[in-house]
């Protein structure tokens, strides 16, 4: 199958020397016979260099082509354009684990070329909705605020909402280091024998990042020995903007192959989706389309959905794809089109907070605006622990009340607060200092995080823990009276 597909991509099509204009990353061609939407073209410049492009728009005998490597040096005298008759396909193989590629999928780690097991369309194959399986079973990140209060189900898509200057890269690297499937103590031996740990893989796609960030991730994966289960795709800030549009699609095509053909549980991390949205806006402006909110194209919601909706699980296939896109909110504005539309498509969000960061709390995850919509299906008896849901609800309630008391204290002073209010203030401080805060290399499994949560909840008398049933309190509250 693979050789035939390869042969198709090499099929020589018609060549044209009819470039009529260049606009930003786009080339306009006239007198083209039968161009196809999304067809791949090879552009040969006067100096002999070749670039790749893709047909974006067809109007009779006119074709608009976006050039992945940029349009500098393209003229209407010496440039020839060859239409291949193929859509953009990427070679995929199990050997891609442990390798580093550029945003177009070419190896940049001085290793040998990939021997492809298949060539797959980067837009992905459509999935029958009735064949999708509901995401279940928790992915453990080792970060208490995520695991206890915003649990991520296998097959979920949940973004990190961050902003400039916040440690989203460090959090993403920590998740990559620590992420794995939940194992009970009595199950860990069995899981090790069954090779469950070997079944976990990470596909990491960086779009528009600077060299420092790219080196940080590369070094982090290599130093921690997790590189062998990671595939990296790096589109740097000085790489062509247009390449950012295909980078997440190539990464997801690789993830789909690893998940559905190789049976792996794949975690896909996409950073920074704001750079992707800006690339989309640049192409839209070059095409002179009617702009939407803040200059972004009106179809950005649909376009983002074609990326995010590729997460999930399929009936009869062992693997799964879990997505954690990272986006930086310009001016910390959650109403900006990119986070706004992302929030509509994805199943929750994890909010990285500047105030917590300014107080030297790492990871600065604010649990109040954070949400995991599929948490209920990933936790509970048999998956984590029977008290998980109740503990999470009680932590949310007490933290929210603690925030209100803190605001009231600023107005009326501490003397006017009741003894009950002071308990909430004590909880607020200990929750942020002991539960939210943890080291970048401090891994807590879900059972350690739940035990830590109970230590904090014992600050309160039983009567104030309204969200936890009496049966659960009988089992867990009196284990250890100290706090």
From Swiss-Prot:
InterPro entries: ATP-synt_VA_C, ATPase_a/bsu_AS, ATPase_F1/V1/A1_a/bsu_N, ATPase_F1/V1/A1_a/bsu_nucl-bd, ATPase_V1-cplx_bsu, P-loop_NTPase, V-ATPase_su_B/beta. This is V-type proton ATPase subunit B 2. The keyword Metal-binding does not apply. GO terms for molecular function: ATP binding; proton-transporting ATPase activity, rotational mechanism. The keyword Ion transport applies. CDD domains: ATP-synt_V_A-type_beta_C (cd18112), ATP-synt_V_A-type_beta_N (cd18118), V_A-ATPase_B (cd01135). V-ATPase is a heteromultimeric enzyme composed of a peripheral catalytic V1 complex (main components: subunits A, B, C, D, E, and F) attached to an integral membrane V0 proton pore complex (main component: the proteolipid protein). It comes from Hordeum vulgare (Barley). Signal peptide: none annotated. Coiled coil: none annotated.
């Amino acid at each position: 199958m693979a050789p035939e597909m390869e042969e198709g991509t090499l099929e020589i099509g018609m060549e044209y020397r009819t470039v009529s204009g260049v606009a930003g990353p786009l080339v306009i061609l006239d007198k083209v016979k039968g161009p196809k939407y999304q067809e791949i073209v090879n552009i040969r410049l006067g100096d002999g260099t070749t670039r790749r492009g893709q047909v974006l728009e067809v109007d009779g005998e006119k074709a608009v082509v976006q050039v992945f490597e940029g349009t500098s040096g393209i003229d209407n005298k010496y440039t020839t354009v060859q239409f291949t008759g193929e859509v953009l396909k990427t070679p995929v193989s199990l050997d891609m684990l442990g390798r580093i590629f550029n945003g177009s999928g070419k190896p940049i780690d001085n290793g040998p070329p990939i021997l492809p097991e298949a060539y797959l369309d980067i837009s992905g194959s459509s999935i029958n909705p009735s064949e999708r399986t509901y995401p279940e079973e928790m992915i453990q990140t080792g970060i208490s605020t995520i695991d206890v209060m915003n649990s991520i189900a296998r097959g979920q898509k949940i973004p990190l909402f961050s902003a400039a200057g916040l440690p989203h890269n460090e959090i993403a690297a920590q998740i990559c280091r620590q992420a794995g499937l939940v194992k009970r103590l009595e199950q860990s031996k069995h899981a090790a024998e069954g090779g469950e740990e070997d079944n976990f893989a990470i596909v990491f796609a960086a779009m528009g990042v600077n060299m420092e960030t790219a080196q940080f991730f590369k070094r982090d994966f290599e130093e921690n020995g997790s590189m062998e289960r990671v595939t990296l795709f790096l589109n740097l800030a000085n790489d062509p903007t247009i390449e950012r549009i295909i980078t997440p699609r190539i990464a997801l095509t690789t993830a789909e192959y690893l998940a559905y053909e190789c049976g792996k549980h794949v975690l896909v991390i996409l950073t920074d989706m704001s750079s992707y949205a800006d690339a989309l806006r640049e192409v839209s402006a070059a095409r002179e389309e009617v702009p939407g909110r803040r200059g972004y194209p009106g179809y950005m919601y649909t376009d983002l959905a074609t990326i995010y909706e590729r997460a999930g699980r399929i009936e009869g296939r062992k693997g799964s794809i879990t997505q954690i896109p990272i986006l930086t909110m310009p001016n910390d504005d959650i109403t900006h089109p990119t986070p706004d539309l992302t929030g509509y498509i994805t199943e929750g969000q994890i909010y990285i907070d500047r105030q917590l960061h300014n107080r030297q709390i790492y990871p600065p995850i604010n649990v109040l605006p954070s949400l995991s919509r599929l948490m209920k299906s990933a936790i509970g008896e048999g998956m984590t622990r029977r008290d998980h849901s109740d503990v999470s609800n009680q932590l949310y309630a007490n933290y929210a009340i603690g925030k209100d008391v803190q605001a009231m204290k600023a107005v009326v002073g501490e003397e006017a607060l009741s003894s009950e209010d002071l308990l909430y203030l004590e909880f607020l401080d200990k929750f942020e200092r002991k539960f939210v805060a943890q080291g970048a290399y401090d891994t807590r499994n879900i059972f350690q995080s739940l035990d830590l949560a109970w230590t904090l909840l014992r600050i309160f008398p039983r009567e104030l823990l309204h969200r936890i049933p009496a049966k659960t309190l009988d089992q867990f509250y009196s284990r250890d009276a100290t706090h």
